[in-house]
Swiss-Prot record:
Residues bearing PTM N-acetylserine: 2
Keywords attached to this entry: Acetylation, Cell membrane, Cell projection, Cytoplasm, Glycoprotein, Membrane, Nucleus
Name of this chain's protein: SH3 domain-binding glutamic acid-rich-like protein 3
Positions glycosylated per UniProt: 9
Subcellular location: Cytoplasm, Cytosol; Cell projection, Ruffle membrane; Nucleus
One Pfam assignment: SH3BGR
Post-translational modification, as annotated: May be glycosylated.
Length: 93
Protein backbone atom coordinates (compact mmCIF):
# COMPACT_ATOMS: atom_id res chain seq x y z
CA UNK A 1 0.00 0.00 0.00
CA UNK A 2 1.23 3.48 -0.76
CA UNK A 3 0.37 6.86 0.65
CA UNK A 4 -0.43 8.04 4.13
CA UNK A 5 -2.64 5.71 6.18
CA UNK A 6 -4.20 6.18 9.60
CA UNK A 7 -5.12 2.92 11.26
CA UNK A 8 -8.25 3.39 13.35
CA UNK A 9 -11.19 1.43 14.68
CA UNK A 10 -14.90 2.14 14.47
CA UNK A 11 -15.58 -0.31 17.30
CA UNK A 12 -14.07 0.60 20.65
CA UNK A 13 -15.29 1.17 24.16
CA UNK A 14 -12.36 3.47 24.85
CA UNK A 15 -13.14 7.18 24.86
CA UNK A 16 -9.41 7.86 24.76
CA UNK A 17 -8.94 5.96 21.48
CA UNK A 18 -12.01 7.64 19.95
CA UNK A 19 -10.73 11.06 20.99
CA UNK A 20 -7.21 10.41 19.71
CA UNK A 21 -8.46 9.14 16.34
CA UNK A 22 -10.71 12.15 16.00
CA UNK A 23 -7.90 14.59 16.79
CA UNK A 24 -5.51 12.99 14.29
CA UNK A 25 -8.05 13.11 11.45
CA UNK A 26 -9.16 16.64 12.39
CA UNK A 27 -5.58 17.93 12.22
CA UNK A 28 -4.83 16.14 8.94
CA UNK A 29 -8.08 17.43 7.42
CA UNK A 30 -7.36 20.95 8.68
CA UNK A 31 -3.94 20.89 7.04
CA UNK A 32 -5.44 19.39 3.86
CA UNK A 33 -3.16 16.36 4.05
CA UNK A 34 -4.58 13.41 2.13
CA UNK A 35 -4.72 10.08 3.91
CA UNK A 36 -6.57 6.79 3.89
CA UNK A 37 -8.44 5.71 7.00
CA UNK A 38 -7.98 1.97 7.61
CA UNK A 39 -10.60 0.49 9.96
CA UNK A 40 -8.96 -2.45 11.72
CA UNK A 41 -12.28 -3.54 13.28
CA UNK A 42 -13.36 -4.85 9.86
CA UNK A 43 -10.59 -7.44 9.53
CA UNK A 44 -8.14 -9.01 11.99
CA UNK A 45 -5.53 -9.11 9.21
CA UNK A 46 -5.58 -5.28 9.16
CA UNK A 47 -5.01 -5.19 12.92
CA UNK A 48 -2.10 -7.60 12.54
CA UNK A 49 -0.71 -5.49 9.67
CA UNK A 50 -0.91 -2.34 11.82
CA UNK A 51 0.88 -4.05 14.71
CA UNK A 52 3.58 -5.47 12.43
CA UNK A 53 4.25 -2.04 10.90
CA UNK A 54 4.36 -0.48 14.38
CA UNK A 55 6.70 -3.22 15.59
CA UNK A 56 4.48 -3.67 18.64
CA UNK A 57 2.19 -6.72 19.07
CA UNK A 58 -0.03 -4.71 21.44
CA UNK A 59 -0.27 -1.45 19.45
CA UNK A 60 -3.67 0.23 19.48
CA UNK A 61 -5.11 2.83 17.10
CA UNK A 62 -4.44 5.41 15.96
CA UNK A 63 -1.19 4.42 14.23
CA UNK A 64 0.17 6.37 11.26
CA UNK A 65 2.06 4.88 8.32
CA UNK A 66 3.33 6.31 5.04
CA UNK A 67 3.74 3.60 2.42
CA UNK A 68 5.48 0.82 4.30
CA UNK A 69 7.27 3.24 6.65
CA UNK A 70 5.95 3.52 10.18
CA UNK A 71 5.52 7.16 11.27
CA UNK A 72 4.26 6.74 14.82
CA UNK A 73 1.35 6.72 17.23
CA UNK A 74 -0.87 9.46 18.65
CA UNK A 75 1.68 10.75 21.17
CA UNK A 76 4.41 11.11 18.54
CA UNK A 77 1.91 12.72 16.15
CA UNK A 78 0.91 15.37 18.72
CA UNK A 79 4.56 16.00 19.57
CA UNK A 80 5.31 16.60 15.87
CA UNK A 81 2.36 19.01 15.59
CA UNK A 82 3.54 20.95 18.66
CA UNK A 83 7.11 21.11 17.35
CA UNK A 84 5.94 22.09 13.86
CA UNK A 85 7.64 19.00 12.36
CA UNK A 86 4.51 17.25 11.09
CA UNK A 87 5.69 17.04 7.45
CA UNK A 88 8.87 15.27 8.56
CA UNK A 89 6.98 13.01 10.97
CA UNK A 90 4.61 11.96 8.19
CA UNK A 91 7.60 11.41 5.88
CA UNK A 92 6.20 13.95 3.41
CA UNK A 93 9.20 16.31 3.47
Amino acid sequence: MSGLRVYSTSVTGSREIKSQQSEVTRILDGKRIQYQLVDISQDNALRDEMRALAGNPKATPPQIVNGDQYCGDYELFVEAVEQNTLQEFLKLA
